[in-house]
Swiss-Prot record:
It comes from the Archaea. The gene is cdc6-1. CDD domains: AAA, Cdc6_C, HLD_clamp_RarA. This is ORC1-type DNA replication protein 1. NCBIfam families: orc1/cdc6 family replication initiation protein, PRK00411.1-3. One of its GO terms (biological process) is DNA replication. InterPro entries: AAA+_ATPase, AAA_22, Cdc6_C, Cdc6_lid, ORC1/CDC6, Orc1/Cdc6_arc, P-loop_NTPase, WH-like_DNA-bd_sf.
Length: 398
C-alpha cells in the first residue's frame, strides 16, 4: 500500500504542469483585474471621502456569481488602506460562512481587538459593546458584508438595520457598509428603512463575455502554469463553457485548474481538450453533491421521491405522482409529510437549482400539469443524500 502512495507522490513531484496552482483558486486576488476598470473607478470614487477622514456612502454591489464583485471590492479596499491606513480600518465578512447576527457582531469585535466568548452574551449586549468599541476608534470603520442575501434569507434584516442605525446611535458618522450580493432582486425584500440606508450608492457588475474570459484565463495561465503547458484551444474552450454559464470567471478558472489537475494525474505534459471535458464532468459532479447535501430535509426527501418514481415508471412524473411517492417515503421513516402545495414549491426550487426539470404541459381536457424529471447524475444524488442524512439513508436498510 505504501508503495502505491510513494509512486503517486513521486509522479506528482515530477509534474511540470503547475508553476503555482494557488493562483487559480477563488480566494486569490490578482494585482490586475482586467475588464473591471469602470467598476474599480466607480468604487474608488465612492470611497474617496476616506481620503479626508470622512465616512463614504453605503454601497450595494450587485452581479451574478463570478463577475468579479468580491475580487474588485477586496482589491480596492486593500489598495486604499495601503495608502491611507490612518483614515480607516476595514473588516471583510462572508455572511454565508459567518451566518448568524451573533457571529457577525462577534467577528467585528474580534477584528477590532476585543475578545468575545463563543456563547453566553446576548446579541443586544454584543451590539452595545460594538457601538462602544467603534466610538473609541479614531478611524472610520468600513464593513464589507459578502453574500449578504444568504444572511437575510436565513435570519432577516434586523442585523443590517442595527448596523445602518449605528451612526445615528453614536451621533457620529463612523461606520460605512459595503453589501455584496448575487441576487439582483434581493433588495426588494428588505425593510424600506434598511433599503434606503444601504442603497445610497449602487454598482452593477455585468457578466464577462467569451473574449474577456479568454483574456483573463491567458493572463492567469501565464502565472499558474509552466510555459507551453496550456494551448489557446484549451483556453478558448474553458472561456466558451463559462461564457454560456452567465459569464462566470470563477467557473472558467475552476475549469482550467481542475483540467490541470486531471492532466497531472494522467502524467501528461500538456493540457488537452479531453482534460477539460473530464474536468467539466468532475466539477459538475462536485457541484451537484454540494447542492444536494445542503438541501433541507424535506427537499431531499422530495428529490429522492423523484429518483425512485422515475426509475419505477420509466418516464417523467406529474407533481401528484411525486407527492404520492414522497408521502410513502415519509411514512416509512416515521416523519410527518408536508402539504402537496409545499411539495409543489419544493419542485420549483429544485428546478431553479438545476437538479431537476419541471416542464408545464397541457393535457387537453385534463388541464395543465408539470412533467418532472431528474436533470443530473442519479448516483451523485443518492450518494449526497445517503451520506449526509442518516434518517433518509435508513430507507436503504428497509
Amino acid at each position: 500500500m505504501s508503495k502505491i502512495i510513494d509512486e503517486i507522490l513521486s509522479s506528482l513531484s515530477r509534474s511540470r504542469i503547475f508553476r503555482n496552482r494557488e493562483l487559480l483558486l477563488p480566494d486569490y486576488v490578482p494585482e490586475e483585474l482586467p475588464h473591471r476598470e469602470e467598476q474599480i473607478k466607480r468604487l474608488v470614487e465612492i470611497l474617496s471621502p476616506l481620503m479626508r477622514g470622512e465616512k463614504p456612502n453605503n454601497i450595494f454591489i450587485y452581479g451574478l456569481t463570478g463577475t468579479g464583485k468580491t475580487a474588485v471590492t477586496k482589491f480596492v479596499v486593500k489598495k486604499l488602506h495601503e495608502k491611507i491606513s490612518n483614515s480607516f480600518i476595514y473588516v471583510y465578512i462572508n455572511t454565508r460562512q459567518t451566518d448568524t447576527p451573533y457571529r457577525i457582531l462577534a467577528d467585528l469585535l474580534e477584528n477590532l481587538g476585543s475578545k468575545v466568548p463563543f456563547t453566553g452574551i446576548s446579541t443586544a449586549e454584543l451590539y452595545r459593546r460594538f457601538i462602544k468599541k467603534v466610538l473609541e476608534l479614531k478611524p472610520i470603520l468600513v464593513i464589507v458584508l459578502d453574500e449578504i442575501d444568504a444572511l437575510v434569507k436565513k435570519h432577516g434584516d434586523d442585523i443590517l438595520y442595527r448596523l445602518t442605525r449605528a451612526n445615528y446611535e453614536m451621533g457620529k458618522s463612523k461606520v460605512s457598509i459595503i453589501g455584496i450580493t448575487n441576487d439582483i432582486k434581493f433588495v426588494e425584500f428588505l425593510d424600506p428603512r434598511v433599503k434606503s440606508s444601504l442603497s445610497e450608492e449602487e454598482i452593477v457588475f455585468p457578466p464577462y463575455n467569451a473574449e474577456e474570459l479568454e483574456d483573463i484565463l491567458k493572463r492567469r495561465a501565464t502565472l499558474a502554469f509552466y510555459d507551453s503547458v496550456v494551448s489557446d484551444d484549451v483556453i478558448k474552450l474553458c472561456a466558451a463553457i463559462a461564457a454560456r454559464d452567465h459569464g462566470d470567471a470563477r467557473r472558467a478558472l475552476d475549469l482550467l485548474r481542475v483540467a490541470g489537475e486531471v492532466a497531472e494525474r494522467d502524467g501528461a505534459e500538456k493540457l488537452t481538450i479531453e482534460h477539460v471535458n473530464k474536468a467539466r464532468v468532475e466539477i459538475e459532479r462536485d457541484r451537484v453533491y454540494e447542492v444536494v447535501s445542503t438541501l433541507p430535509f424535506h427537499s431531499k426527501l422530495v428529490l429522492l421521491a423523484i429518483v425512485i418514481g422515475v426509475n419505477e415508471k420509466r418516464r417523467t412524473l406529474t407533481t401528484g405522482e411525486v407527492y404520492d411517492v414522497y408521502t410513502k417515503l415519509a411514512k416509512k421513516i416515521g416523519v410527518e409529510s408536508v402539504t402537496q402545495r409545499r411539495v409543489s414549491d419544493i419542485i420549483n426550487e429544485l428546478d431553479m437549482l438545476g437538479i431537476i426539470t419541471a416542464r408545464v404541459v397541457n393535457r387537453g381536457r385534463y388541464g395543465k400539469t408539470k412533467e418532472v424529471n431528474l436533470a443530473v447524475n442519479e448516483e451523485t444524488v443518492i450518494k449526497a443524500i445517503s451520506e449526509k442524512d442518516s434518517k433518509i439513508a435508513s430507507l436503504w436498510d428497509r
